[in-house]
Amino acid sequence: MNSKKQAFMVSAMKSGSGKTLITLGLINIFKRMGKSISIYKTGPDYIDTMYHEKIAGSPSTNLDPYFLEPAFKPGELKRLFFRNFKNDIAIIEGAMGLFDGIYGEGKRCSACSVSEELFVDVIMIVDMDEFDNLFIYLQSFKHRVKAVILNKVGKNADINMIRLKVNEMGLFLIGYLQFDTNFYIESRHLGLYEPQKSIFDIVNNVSDKLSKTLDFTMLENFYVEEPHDTDIYNDKNIHNVDLNIKQNRYRLAFAFDEAFSFTYEENIKVLEEYGFEIVKFSPIHDKVLPDNISVLWLSGGYPELYAKELSSNISMLKSIYNTNIPIIAECGGFIYLHDFFEDGVGNKYPGVELIKGKAFKTKKLVRFGYIEIEAGSESILMKKNQRIRSHEFHYYDSTCNGEYAHAIKANKSKEWDCINASNNIFAGFPHLYLRGYEFLIQNLVSFLERERDV
């Protein structure tokens, strides 16, 4: 194979520099040119990938440097990137600042570490008023930065002079975007603002302006070489998917509506690889669970914004409460399973009543960040002492967080117990990522097989 394909990462010195907006503009520009784009986001963020998908019309893939850290899961990050790189161009949006990774551990698990693992060069998005800080910033660590796109450039800026300064750093200025108060997307905070219809107008305007300044010839020099090893594209070879398991189709009810929308595209793919038929349903709008299902999955989302609608759908609450199939619930789904849960202003609403206690709003993030989880006993997803990597990000807490597993932050600064796991339930605040942790689904299938044989 070993052919070259156009690919680059978009990064910045810090969050709020216009990375997402300019990434969306680039996606839109290439779409207008008739190019197909494979889109990625480093880190665990659900929201920016939603923006990518809105503009591109195709799924965006999370390349998480902690879940798939090479020292912990050798080869997984590279395998994921190339397996999903089926289009003309790959664009990776880096999370936060280029060197922002595990706190106190340098650039570990940063966007920079992803670019180095994949041998992908980086284009920095730099606000004009931050430009003078770029040179010093790039001295911090080794990197693959090759070019700059300037953001919020004033009408009277001397572009030729700026270009010379960029060249003196050993970089190229390949485009710029003039300042415009209309070029703004509300802060997403890893899940506080989903893309609205107005995003299309904003991105089209950005694309119009940016396309007039982009050096398309220079962009063609950003590429990655495909690997010789064709097995990198074949998950069955790597993960030993049991073909006998694939022949046994299980129907999995997957909550997906306004209240529950946070899931990784790779999770759906892994479930399908292991023989699950995904049946999407709405806890808000549907009256009962889908027919003939073997598993219920309640993903993360915004149940607090739809507390009244969820709690007033009594037939759905009863349908979930009375089911005896395995239930997996992450963060928002976990909140929904409580006896009671609060909306965003503290009003209390009835939940499914499978988790005894109350989920309640706090004034700050609770136990947030990357974590490594170790199981204390066997459950529907994990065996004793098995470990997975995960993350938590929530302003809610619970009177019943669970004690099934023990979580330790990535930098080992804090630790706590988490997850309720008994009989057929696996529910807690941690978000689950299945790629590289396929044993979770192998365990689930084994559980279903045992139950079927009883």
Residue ranges and their predicted role:
Residues 129-240:
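Internal gly/pro-rich beta-alpha loop/helix module
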Residues 192-248, 256-260, 421-454:
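Acyltransferase
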Residues 2-21, 27-118, 126-144, 156-160:
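ATP-dependent carboxylate-amine ligase catalytic core
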Residues 9, 91-93, 123-125, 149, ...:
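Structural motif
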Residues 53, 245-247, 260-270, 277-279, ...:
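C-terminal and late-domain segments of enzyme folds
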Residues 240-322:
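Phosphate-binding active sites in nucleotide-utilizing proteins
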Residues 120, 171, 322-326:
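A short helix->loop->beta-strand "cap" motif at the edges of active sites that frequently abuts
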Residues 303-379:
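Cysteine-nucleophile active-site neighborhood
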